[in-house]
């Protein structure tokens, strides 16, 4: 058994040495060009703004979440996407088991499809705005305030959604179905 494993390992090593181990690129833009594109720059700006300290972690119902909703609304409008909610989103509540109501916000935007037969069918694209917010904890006997900025707590998802909205709005004549964000 040990001999079979040695032979199989040797064969795998030979094939690994034969196959080129470098990435293969087709003709076209380089990684540096892609990283410097309008879309990537805009996404970085969105993530930076949405996860900024002033947003205080965007906890549901917080001022930071309200400011994020206002930012998202402004970007949709800048991109020419119809916004169906208020300037800082629509507030909704979720009743919890203990009787408290957790409030949060939604921003709703819309691009109408160009095909009369399909425009009443919808593609729904979403990303959550809220994140963990802030908390206070005790570490080694001292109180520490912590902010969960949330760049990967869906600021990146919001950025992707905003740039997708821009691209879809730019190409809206090609859309058959309507898109709801």
Residues of each region from the PLM?
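Bacterial Sec-dependent N-terminal signal peptides
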Residues: 1-26
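N-terminal hydrophobic or amphipathic helices/low-complexity stretches enriched
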Residues: 21-67, 72-82, 120-122
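Second-shell loop/turn segments in exported
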Residues: 28-37, 53-63, 93-98, 143-154, ...
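Sec/Tat-exported extracytoplasmic proteins
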Residues: 47, 51-59, 72, 79-83, ...
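Acidic/His- and Gly-rich active-site-bordering loop/insert found
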Residues: 50, 76, 97-139
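A non-catalytic alpha/beta surface segment that caps or lines the substrate-entry region
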Residues: 58-112
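Short secondary-structure junction motifs
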Residues: 86-89, 120, 176-178
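Alpha-helical metal-binding/catalytic segments enriched in His/Glu/Asp
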Residues: 109, 125-126, 131, 136-181
């Amino acid at each position: 058994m040990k001999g079979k494993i040695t032979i199989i390992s040797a064969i795998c090593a030979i094939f690994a040495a034969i196959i080129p181990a470098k990435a293969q690129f087709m003709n076209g833009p380089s990684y540096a060009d892609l990283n410097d594109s309008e879309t990537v720059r805009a996404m970085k700006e969105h993530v930076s703004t949405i996860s900024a300290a002033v947003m205080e972690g965007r906890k549901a119902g917080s001022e930071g979440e309200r400011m994020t909703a206002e930012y998202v609304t402004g970007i949709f409008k800048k991109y020419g996407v119809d916004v169906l909610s208020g300037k800082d989103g629509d507030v909704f509540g979720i009743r919890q088991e203990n009787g408290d109501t957790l409030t949060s916000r939604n921003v709703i935007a819309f691009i109408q499809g160009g095909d009369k037969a399909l425009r009443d069918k919808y593609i729904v694209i979403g990303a959550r705005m809220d994140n963990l917010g802030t908390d206070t904890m005790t570490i080694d006997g001292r109180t520490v305030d912590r902010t969960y900025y949330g760049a990967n707590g869906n600021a990146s998802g919001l950025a992707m959604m905003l740039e997708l909205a821009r691209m879809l709005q730019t190409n809206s004549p090609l859309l058959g179905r309507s898109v709801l964000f």
